[in-house]
């Protein structure tokens, strides 16, 4: 039921955004980042398809596609039958932009070291570290959790990747009933 509620909420947000590609891009970013945290590939795919329908900017589309791909890898989900991730990545204009480098990295055209060396500033360097760690985590390597925790505590706190790293490394608290009856 929660999954269906999340999908309905995303659909409503996209309906409210209409054809405004900037607003739809923001909705897609939020939905795809939530999908990664919830390990829900279908939620991410829904966000990606809508972002593509409104022709979201490359800077939004690349992140949504990356997060959907990582979600698929983390859950061992097969790519969608329409291969939306590949279509989105191939639609990104190639050149020297950071979005282009991220798309190339996701397609395997750049390795982690090449992505890191192409990062020009603190946000890009943080993102390069995040994606290298996430690729390992998606493959089952939990030894990268300290690296993600470092990213979460780093100086690029405004990045969605920093928030994702924080959420992924936060201790999980099990809440239960109190040991004795409450008054």
State the predicted function of each range.
Residues 59-116:
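Alpha-helical scaffold segments of alpha-solenoid architecture
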Residues 23, 30, 66-69, 127-131, ...:
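"A position-specific structural signal for the A-helix of alpha-solenoid helical repeats
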Residues 127, 149-183:
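A cross-kingdom marker for long, charged
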Residues 3-15, 41-53, 78-92, 110-120, ...:
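Alpha-helical repeat scaffolds
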Residues 24, 61-63, 118, 125, ...:
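Residues that mark the junctions of alpha-helical repeat units in TPR/alpha-solenoid scaffolds
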């Amino acid at each position: 039921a929660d999954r269906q509620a999340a999908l309905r909420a995303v659909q409503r947000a996209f309906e409210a955004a209409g054809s405004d590609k900037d607003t739809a891009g923001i909705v897609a970013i939020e939905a795809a980042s939530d999908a990664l945290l919830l390990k829900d590939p279908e939620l991410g795919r829904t966000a990606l398809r809508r972002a593509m329908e409104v022709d979201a900017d490359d800077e939004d589309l690349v992140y949504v596609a990356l997060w959907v791909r990582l979600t698929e890898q983390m859950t061992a989900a097969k790519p969608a039958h329409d291969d939306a991730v590949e279509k989105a990545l191939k639609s990104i204009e190639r050149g020297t932009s950071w979005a282009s480098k991220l798309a190339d990295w996701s397609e395997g055209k750049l390795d982690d070291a090449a992505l890191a060396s192409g990062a020009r500033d603190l946000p890009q360097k943080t993102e390069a570290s995040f994606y290298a760690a996430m690729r390992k985590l998606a493959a089952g390597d939990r030894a990268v959790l300290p690296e993600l925790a470092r990213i979460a505590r780093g100086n690029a706190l405004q990045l969605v990747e920093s928030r994702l790293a924080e959420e992924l490394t936060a201790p999980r608290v099990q809440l239960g009933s109190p040991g004795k009856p409450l008054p």
